[in-house]
């Protein structure tokens, strides 16, 4: 296993399979968070297509990466809960 330099840029890519057009709905719902990040320590791209949502995160350090991953996964979970309660 390759060691990660905790001080240099670190990356994560999360792919989530979603039914129907839910990936597009999710992309639109996350757009405000992507466009106006709460921290300058991470950059995020969210792409939807073919029933998948892909979240790509680049962060300045491991702590910032962890925080961004946790935030986006929480937002995805919240959106899924809301969509589930509407259906």
Positions of PLM-derived features:
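N-terminal intrinsically disordered, cationic/polar leader segments
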Residues: 1-87
């Amino acid at each position: 296993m390759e060691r990660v330099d905790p001080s240099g840029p670190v990356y994560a890519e999360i792919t989530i399979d979603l039914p129907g057009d839910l990936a597009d709905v999710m992309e639109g719902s996350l757009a405000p968070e992507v466009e106006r990040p709460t921290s300058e320590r991470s950059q995020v791209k969210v792409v939807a297509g073919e029933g998948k949502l892909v979240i790509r995160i680049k962060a300045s350090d491991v702590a910032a990466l962890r925080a961004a991953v946790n935030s986006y996964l929480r937002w995805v979970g919240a959106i899924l809960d809301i969509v589930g309660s509407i259906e």
